[in-house]
């Protein structure tokens, strides 16, 4: 077998059917094979180690030919006013990064087509040529392009950052030159006749600036952060100023040692003093509402006795003491002693668990009270007037003192004695019923009613743990004489049964 010439010998990895040599392939054909547009058929085959070295040399030559400098990558603002945003041309970005099909590789980037006005604007800035004005150009957001270069092309981003720094340095230099030129022009002498006018204009501008600054401080920047103390300072609110005699400090404003006299001390009401151990306490400590009573019937009987005695003997004094409680401050010390002395003999048998004055005021019948009169009222149960009740008989209606509800006593299952008692005080219906002691309508499940006057009481307001079974009468409806109780026997009944 004869040896062929050096040009006729086939290479080890070359296909016999392919007349063209891979090493002799032109750069243009190589670019067509590497492109992803799909317009030309791609000829690919397995290469040996010798062909791989040749392909690397070819790719390096292509990159050297297609190098795009970072100075040509332009960032512009559109629209050029204050509302504009910064963009880059996709064609320039793809050439700078060396990506042939940029849209296919990064489809998630926000892009838009350039308008005709935008192309003319870029043509004036010498960003594009006249030929490119007729082509379809695409704009990308500059912040997304910068993020892409930071993540995937750090070397390209570093090169582009150097160019940006040089441009910023050049801009500052140009600005300084303009400022120096303006300073040289301003060194010219100003006419003396125009100096007062310039002074007035300067004063007017300063006044406008100060007024705007103060207005912003009062409206927009009232609070500020103190850097030294790390405290947010807020303007102090407006307060009413008391006269000087009301704020004058006394000779003994505060006690320096325990037991020393001072001007500031708590003033107790007469009812509060009855619970305090001043030689002898008049009242037992009030029962805890959460603890069950030992004998609810006995306690209610004792309370009724005390209430009856209070109703007969202590009408005037209870009114006066309730006035002191509502005012919140007791009389002076000398008047307190005399007032306490008068009350001492009259209030010994009053109800021990709550304020006797407050209960007597709320539970007593108002003198000269006249019930409400509603001429055309209807019963809320049978929906009939006073001419006929549910039994077809004429019967007068009773009316709630707080709302417009009315009803026949027979429809409400009330006796004649109860109706006569209701007409002596401001009666309340079931919807408006409040506790006589605390005056609150809450805790309906713990509210009970007197069988004589239909007044409402909370169980915890009268010292009961639960609603007693059977007949229950409040303190103000008791008729039996009161039974005295000793202070030492707390929680026990004084009478048997």
Curated annotation (Swiss-Prot):
Residues 88-294 are annotated as: SAY. InterPro entries: PHF10_PHD_finger_1, Znf_FYVE_PHD, Znf_PHD, Znf_PHD-finger, Znf_RING/FYVE/PHD. The lineage of its organism: Eukaryota, Metazoa, Chordata, Craniata, Vertebrata. One of its GO terms (biological process) is positive regulation of T cell differentiation. GO terms for molecular function: zinc ion binding. The modification Phosphoserine is found at residues 11, 35, 49, 269, 296, 300, 326, 330. CDD domains: PHD1_PHF10, PHD2_PHF10, WH_NTD_PHF10. PANTHER family: HL01030P-RELATED, PHD FINGER PROTEIN 10. Residues 1-61, 284-368 are annotated as: Disordered. Keywords: Isopeptide bond, Metal-binding, Neurogenesis, Nucleus, Phosphoprotein, Repeat, Transcription, Transcription regulation, Ubl conjugation, Zinc, Zinc-finger. Widely expressed. Expressed selectively in neural stem and progenitor cells (at protein level). It comes from Mus musculus (Mouse). GO terms for cellular component: chromatin; kinetochore; npBAF complex; nuclear matrix; RSC-type complex; SWI/SNF complex. PROSITE patterns: ZF_PHD_1, ZF_PHD_2. It is found in: Nucleus. There is a cross-link at residues 240, 384 (Glycyl lysine isopeptide (Lys-Gly) (interchain with G-Cter in SUMO2)). A zinc finger (PHD-type) spans 378-435, 437-480. This is PHD finger protein 10. Involved in transcription activity regulation by chromatin remodeling. Belongs to the neural progenitors-specific chromatin remodeling complex (npBAF complex) and is required for the proliferation of neural progenitors. During neural development a switch from a stem/progenitor to a post-mitotic chromatin remodeling mechanism occurs as neurons exit the cell cycle and become committed to their adult state. The transition from proliferating neural stem/progenitor cells to post-mitotic neurons requires a switch in subunit composition of the npBAF and nBAF complexes. Residues 1-13, 284-295 have a biased composition (Low complexity). Belongs to the SAYP family.
């Amino acid at each position: 077998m004869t040896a062929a010439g050096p040009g006729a010998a086939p290479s080890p990895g070359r296909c016999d059917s392919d007349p063209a040599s891979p090493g002799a392939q032109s750069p243009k054909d190589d670019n067509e094979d590497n492109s992803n547009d799909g317009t030309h058929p791609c000829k690919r085959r397995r290469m040996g180690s010798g062909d791989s070295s040749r392909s690397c040399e070819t790719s390096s030559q292509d990159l050297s030919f297609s190098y795009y400098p970072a100075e040509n990558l332009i960032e512009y603002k559109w629209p050029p006013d204050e509302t504009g945003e910064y963009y880059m041309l996709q064609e320039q970005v793809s050439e700078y990064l060396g990506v042939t099909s940029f849209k296919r590789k990064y489809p998630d980037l926000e892009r838009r087509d350039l308008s005709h006005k935008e192309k003319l604007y870029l043509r004036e800035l010498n960003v594009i040529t006249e030929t490119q004005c007729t082509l379809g150009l695409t704009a990308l957001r500059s912040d997304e392009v910068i993020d892409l270069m930071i993540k995937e092309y750090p070397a390209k981003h570093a090169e582009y950052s150097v160019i940006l720094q040089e441009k910023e340095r050049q801009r500052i230099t140009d600005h300084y030159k303009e400022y120096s030129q303006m300073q040289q022009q301003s060194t010219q002498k100003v006419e003396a006749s125009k100096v007062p006018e310039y002074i007035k204009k300067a004063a007017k501008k300063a006044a406008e600036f100060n007024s705007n600054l103060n207005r912003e401080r009062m409206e927009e920047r009232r609070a500020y952060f103190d850097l030294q103390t790390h405290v947010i300072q807020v303007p102090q609110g407006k307060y009413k100023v008391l006269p000087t005699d009301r704020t004058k400090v006394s000779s003994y404003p505060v006690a320096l040692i325990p037991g020393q006299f001072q001007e500031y001390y708590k003033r107790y009401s007469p009812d509060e003093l009855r619970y305090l151990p001043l030689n002898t306490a008049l009242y037992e400590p009030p029962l805890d509402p959460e603890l069950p009573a030992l004998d609810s019937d006995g306690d209610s009987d004792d309370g009724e006795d005390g209430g009856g005695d209070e109703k007969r003997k202590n009408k005037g004094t209870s009114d006066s003491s309730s006035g002191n409680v509502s005012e919140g401050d007791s009389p002076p010390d000398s008047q307190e002693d005399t007032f306490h002395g008068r009350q001492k003999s009259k209030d010994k048998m009053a109800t021990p668990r709550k304020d006797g004055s407050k209960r007597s005021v709320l539970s007593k019948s108002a003198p000269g009270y006249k019930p409400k009169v509603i001429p055309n009222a209807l019963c809320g149960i049978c929906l009939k007037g006073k001419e006929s009740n549910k039994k077809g008989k004429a019967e007068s209606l009773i009316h709630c003192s707080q709302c417009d509800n009315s009803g026949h006593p027979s429809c409400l299952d009330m006796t004649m004695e109860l109706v006569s008692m209701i007409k002596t005080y401001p009666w309340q219906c079931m919807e408006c019923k409040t506790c006589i002691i605390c005056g609150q309508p809450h805790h309906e499940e713990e509210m009970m009613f007197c069988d004589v006057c239909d007044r409402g009481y909370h169980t915890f307001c009268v010292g009961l743990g639960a609603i007693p079974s059977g007949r229950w009468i409040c303190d103000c409806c008791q008729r039996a004489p009161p039974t005295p109780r000793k202070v030492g026997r707390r929680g026990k009944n004084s009478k048997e049964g």
